Amino acid sequence: MANVVVVGAQWGDEGKGKVVDIYTEFADDVVRYQGGNNAGHTLVVGDEKIVLHLIPSGILHKGKRCIIGNGVVLDPEVFIREITNLKAKGKFQDDGVLLLSESLHIIMPYHKRIDIAREAKSGAKKIGTTGRGIGPAYEDKIGRRGIRLMDLLDKQVFTRKLKESLEEKNFLLEKMLGEKPFSFEEIFDEYSAFADTLRTYVADTTLVLHQDLKAGKKLLFEGAQGTLLDVDHGTYPYVTSSSTCAGGACTGTGASPRDINEIIGISKAYVTRVGSGPFPTELEDADGEKLRQTGGEFGATTGRPRRCGWFDALVIKYAVRVNGLTGIALTKLDVLSDFETIKICTGYSYNGKFLSELPANLDIFEKCQPVYEEMPGWQTDITAARSFDDLPEKARTYVKRLEELAGCPIVLVSVGPRRDQTIMLKNPFEA
């Protein structure tokens, strides 16, 4: 038996969707453990591109149980729209394989309005939020005033909690943010209708997980965003509002740390970031634009162009450390195929000092300059490679150098967006 956690090892958008899609073949359950619809997983199935924001990627595989855990914040409208779209495409028909934790928190309309209004007032201090209400929903969760799915399903409880919440939220919207307040009726009627649809999928998912673990089933835990966006371990305050690291797989589902066997970090062969915050290897030149266009680096959720830069070994070393990575899945190696020279950041220069580890102090991090090592590019198409030996020697040398710098084995190399454009060096489910 092997249970595997998949985490982003950079700032998100590393290609987790494709890797999870591949690993799902070997799992019985696929479990989403944090975040909300601020994340977008892009999958290419045949010639069709499918983008999922909430539902685990495993939904595209027949016979796999998909669970959205208690660590997720759920926008009911988005969830229902995803189900409807998947059913219309013939990708999902069995409601019994999709479960929602009764304990997860619900994103309300006022969360979204507050999110957008705050960002608009932030000026130069913008975080780069997606405006989906994720942060305000987690605020209510931590403040012990959130509305959970089990509350939404009980009209009496929902009525009481919504009235209490609106009293506070409308004051905030009107008096502090200058925004229009909400009426009780408009939210209650809309969300009561959502509840009727959601009821089909609700379960005590922690109990289900432990029953499946006891039965010897294999679990795949699917994270969203990336390590450097973790609320505790990321580049705070330029982070998301949940625990994106491997530890979140336990707190966000009810699984025990003893149940986790392998932790795979997903990393691009270069680096991207969306929104504000430090990014030492960012390229604001022709090379950066080339990475963006060749890699299709535009957000699956927002459509925003991603900031692009060279591979940063310090970021990956940090991800290995705080997640306890047992392997790295390297994605988008093919995007580098047209570069004559490829750079790797092996350290930072700060005030005349050489830094070999990621600084925790944001003021220092923002002033760090990358120290590069240059490697020759392979300048040939690698999308047909299906084994490591199929890669050009210079591409193999590049991968081995990244592995050496990370201090963690690379267990998968992706050379294109399709499922079959993958070189699996080691299967974590067979470890």
Swiss-Prot record:
Keyword Metal-binding: yes
InterPro entries: Adenylosuccin_syn_GTP-bd, Adenylosuccin_syn_Lys_AS, Adenylosuccinate_synth_dom1, Adenylosuccinate_synth_dom2, Adenylosuccinate_synth_dom3, Adenylosuccinate_synthetase, P-loop_NTPase
The protein's Enzyme Commission number: 6.3.4.4
Coiled-coil region list: none
Cofactor note: Binds 1 Mg(2+) ion per subunit.
Annotated binding of GTP, by residue: 12-18, 40-42, 306, 332-334, 414-416
Cofactor: Mg(2+)
Subunit structure: Homodimer.
The protein's name: Adenylosuccinate synthetase
Species assigned in the record: Geotalea daltonii (strain DSM 22248 / JCM 15807 / FRC-32)
